Amino acid sequence: MGSILFLLIVIILVLWILASCIRIVPQAYAIVLERLGAYQATWGTGVHFKLPFVERVARKVNLKEQVVDFPPQPVITKDNVTMQIDTVVFFQITDPKLYAYGVENPIMAIENLSATTLRNIIGDMELDETLTSREVINTKMRASLDVATDPWGIKVNRVELKNIIPPAAIQEAMEKQMKAERERREAIPVSYTHLTLPTTP
């Protein structure tokens, strides 16, 4: 009786170990596998088997496009105006191995790199140019971030400036200017109503 119970325990234990060694990788994901602490392989979509005790899953990587919305960053323009700009970065992991071992915290690294790149770009532009050159800034940032993140197995698809917030005094002056321009345009049709067309003799 005791030997049968022992055999059942052994069988259950073996089945449990085998089951724990089978991994199913879903669509748009990858798994970085290590053997004895060193990189062994990258698994794509499908069913895989890892050796018990000597192999382990180091990281499960999402290969879909991801979006990170960073908080506003203080930047200074060429004409010494301090403003707040927040950015949205769209990126995709192209090399799971590099992503797993390239940098400790990839998202934080992208945020710091994004802030530094933004400050460098805005530092070469004056306020008026900054406010009217969103697409130029987006393109420059995407190109710079894409090159810098390539060793981390990351491709930056696009960057968008979400908000450009100038100082309160400048923002108020801009609003007054826009209001005056709007009132001027609205006044033009009214002035024409007071014109009298000449009568034909």
Predicted regions and their residues:
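N-terminal hydrophobic membrane-entry segments
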Residues: M1-R184, I188
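Single conserved hydrophobic/aromatic residue that forms the stacking wall/gate
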Residues: L197-P201
